[in-house]
Regions:
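N-acyltransferase acceptor-side catalytic subdomain
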Residues: 1-165
Length: 165
């Protein structure tokens, strides 16, 4: 269950569409955009190109939130074995990135992923149910679930766009 009552209400409204791997380049460009005027980003053009290549190979994935046909939020990351490593997210409308994250979490659970690494503890991610774990426990999770020999693949575009109950 999601920890935020207002997000559950938003998810049930269904005034949005969620897609997987539909427009990865647009998501990474949006994530790379500075959050404030004159701001900088770690997602340089070279980093973007590398992730786009990893997407084409089936390792990097995006989750996109659309409203009225417009991309308004999303996130991207890497899947290795049954572990997903979130890299960055963006939102152009209230709750748009949270909608993408909630659908990602449900998709990963439905596909037996065991690890969703958000990389940093933030108030935003904690509000979505994220929690920090000790380094040793994280290493054990990776040993058990980040199998390097799994076959990468594109995710089904409509794989996360199911009604929220």
């Amino acid at each position: 269950a999601l920890p935020i009552c207002s997000l559950r209400k938003t998810l049930r409204k269904r005034n949005y569409e969620v897609r997987l791997d539909h427009d990865f380049p647009a998501v990474i460009r949006a994530c790379a955009a500075p959050r404030e005027p004159g701001g900088r980003t770690w997602i340089t053009p070279d980093i973007q190109a590398a992730y786009i290549r990893m997407h084409r190979l089936g390792y990097a994935h995006s989750v996109e939130t659309y409203m009225d046909g417009q991309l308004v939020g999303g996130l991207y990351g890497m899947a290795i074995g049954k572990a997903f490593f979130g890299e960055s997210m963006f939102s152009r409308r209230t709750d748009a990135s949270k909608i993408a994250f909630a659908h990602l979490a449900r998709f990963l659970e439905q596909h037996n992923f065991r690890v969703l690494d958000c990389q940093m503890t933030t108030q935003h991610l904690t509000s979505l149910g994220g929690r920090e774990i000790p380094r040793e426990a994280f290493a054990r999770l990776l040993d058990a679930h980040a199998e390097a020999d799994t076959t990468p693949a594109r995710w089904p575009e409509d794989g996360a766009n199911h009604p929220w109950t």
